[in-house]
Amino acid sequence: MTKTRVEAVKAARVWCLAALLAFAGLAHAELVGPVVAIQDGDTIDVLVNRQPVRVRLAQIDAPEKRQAFGTRSRQALAELVFRQSVRVAETGRDRYGRVIGTVYLGNVDVNAQMVREGMAWVYRQYAKDRGLYELERQAQASSGGLWVDPEPVSPWEYRRDKRERSLAAKRQAQ
């Protein structure tokens, strides 16, 4: 081989390696393990390599623990996945370091199932799956789960109102 051809082959290998590494960074992990804890209606702990990994169900937002339907939502998620082996298709991490992902129990999309049962809202700020909106509409139309309340408060509104009340109380205390 000529010197020029050897250099061209080396350059091609470098480019291939760089491309491979770039695409590897885009791939997300898949976690598999039993669910060992249910934090609330959209957060679970999955045991992976003997370590609990906190997983936030992507694209949905369940009622907060102290919010109406918070306990029921947590219970519904527990009935679906507690002590079951699940697969998590990771889509990223949140600011708290939790894995964000879609949880599967066999072929069942647990995130979608929570919306279908009226146990969670579509998290509009982050949702990309348009099918979730239709599931939410159907749950609402059938008054399923939290939609039994004619005017349910979304978790993001609940959190905002709680922050505002807290700030008002701090200002009043000064």
Where do the language-model regions lie?
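Small beta-barrel nucleic-acid-binding modules, primarily SNase/OB-fold domains
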Residues: T2-V6, R13-C16, F23-Q174
